[in-house]
Regions:
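Helix-start (N-cap) detector for alpha-helical repeat units in TPR-like alpha-solenoids
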Residues: 6-7, 40-41, 74-75
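Conserved structural position within tetratricopeptide repeats
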Residues: 31-34, 67-68
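Register position in tetratricopeptide repeats
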Residues: 18, 52, 82-89
């Protein structure tokens, strides 16, 4: 049952992420990580949600966790570099 619940939480979180409802996405991804705290993709999606919510420090920490679990996660490395630039620039970077 937990694996099924994990997958549902992940899918719902992704749907919120696509709708740019970042706070709800953060909640769902966090719940999924309580079930499976070793999934790099969930950390990556959580990082995207934090980044979308302009919570850059939390996004950076989450991308670092992704890379700690999966050192070859290229997307997390790219996003981490982008978030670190935003932090350095005071979070005022515009796309």
């Amino acid at each position: 049952m937990e694996q099924g619940e994990f997958e549902v939480l992940l899918e719902v979180g992704q749907a919120y992420l696509l709708k740019k409802d970042y706070e709800k996405a953060i909640t769902k991804f966090s719940e999924a990580l309580r079930i499976n705290p070793h999934d790099p993709e969930t950390y990556y999606y959580l990082g995207l949600a934090y980044e979308g919510a302009e919570r850059y420090s939390e996004a950076a920490q989450t991308y670092e966790k992704t890379l700690k679990i999966d050192q070859g996660h290229g997307n997390a490395e790219i996003r981490l570099n982008e978030v670190n630039k935003k932090i350095t620039e005071g979070g005022k970077s515009k796309k």
